[in-house]
């Protein structure tokens, strides 16, 4: 009985290496079968029949590779394509006939053949998809990051339509109509942000008239030292007219322009007086304010809701 127990204890157990050998052998068998299936699938894959260019370039490629052993295959293909285009139809004819014969043989051998193009790799799209913004690149690759970000910005700008002329393209995309007069050559020479200033051309001309009158009156001798105050009043008038709000001003007709010119002559004669006689300064100031106030009431213009020039 003890001898039987000793023999059972002494029986060698299968080692780990022995247990792993069948598994390793099975894995090798599966791998070999997969490799054999891959080779068999490559062998079973039917190639397309050669066209005329392939028939011609078969010998030319070998010859060019022997002459230029360091030349890449893509460069050889480019040169062969350029040489093939330079051949005449008479020179291409035998290769075209050979390609037709090979196609007929291919159709006889594989009547059920159907061309299945291989799927192209999308490496370029993956690179652009997983590219980092400019501020997330490491310091060593700042130049490459700047180039990549610039290319992506140009791409997205082109997709969205926001190129260098973003303002004009935005107007075209949103469908905003333009006035036919906006396409005149005079307006095209001006900047687009200066367009609101064109609406005030009559008022600015009136202000220019007053300013020119102020310059003219500076050279005329005035009594009682009224020259500085007159220049100051006209200068303030020009500044008030220039700082008017952006609302549309009333239309100034030729009648109102003639009235303004008449008032301007009255103001000049008021300073000079009849026969060059001087009047009292307070009377001159009161009449000047009255005439200016009457002019603004007739023109219908109010500056910031207050009567202009009341501070003088």
Swiss-Prot record:
It holds the Pfam family HMG_box. Gene3D superfamilies: High mobility group box domain. GO terms for biological process: brain development; face development; hypothalamus development; negative regulation of neuron differentiation; negative regulation of transcription by RNA polymerase II; neuron differentiation; pituitary gland development; positive regulation of transcription by RNA polymerase II. It is found in: Nucleus. Residues 1-23, 229-254 are annotated as: Disordered. Residues 46-114 bind DNA. Keywords: Developmental protein, DNA-binding, Nucleus, Transcription, Transcription regulation. PROSITE patterns: HMG_BOX_2. It comes from the Eukaryota. The 9aaTAD motif is a transactivation domain present in a large number of yeast and animal transcription factors. This is Transcription factor SOX-3. It comes from Gallus gallus. The lineage of its organism: Eukaryota, Metazoa, Chordata, Craniata, Vertebrata. The gene is SOX3.
């Amino acid at each position: 009985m003890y001898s039987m127990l000793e023999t059972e204890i002494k029986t060698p157990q299968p080692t780990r290496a022995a247990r792993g050998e069948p598994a390793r052998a099975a894995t090798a068998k599966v791998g070999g079968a997969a490799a054999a299936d891959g080779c068999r699938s490559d062998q079973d894959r039917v190639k397309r029949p050669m066209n005329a260019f392939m028939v011609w370039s078969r010998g030319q490629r070998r010859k060019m590779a022997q002459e230029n052993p360091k030349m890449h295959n893509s460069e050889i293909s480019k040169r062969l394509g350029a040489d093939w285009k330079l051949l005449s139809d008479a020179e291409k004819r035998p290769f075209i006939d050979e390609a037709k014969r090979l196609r007929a043989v291919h159709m006889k051998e594989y009547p059920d053949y159907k061309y299945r193009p291989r799927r192209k790799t999308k490496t370029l799209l993956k690179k652009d998809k997983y590219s980092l913004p400019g501020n997330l690149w490491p310091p060593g690759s700042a130049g490459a990051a700047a180039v990549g970000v610039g290319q992506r910005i140009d791409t997205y700008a082109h997709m969205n339509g926001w190129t260098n002329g973003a303002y004009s393209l935005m107007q075209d995309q949103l469908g905003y109509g333009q006035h036919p007069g906006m396409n005149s050559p005079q307006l095209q020479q001006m900047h687009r942000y200066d367009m609101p200033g064109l609406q005030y051309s009559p008022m600015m001309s009136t202000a220019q008239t007053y300013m020119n009158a102020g310059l003219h009156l500076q050279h005329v001798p005035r009594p009682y030292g009224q020259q500085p105050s007159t220049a100051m009043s006209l200068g303030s008038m020009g500044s008030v007219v220039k700082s008017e709000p952006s609302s549309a001003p009333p239309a100034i007709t030729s009648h109102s322009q003639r009235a303004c010119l008449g008032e301007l002559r009255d103001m000049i004669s008021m300073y000079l007086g009849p026969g060059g006689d001087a009047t009292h300064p307070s009377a001159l100031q009161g009449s000047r304010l009255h005439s200016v106030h009457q002019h603004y009431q007739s023109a219908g213009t109010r500056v910031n809701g207050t009567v202009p020039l009341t501070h003088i």
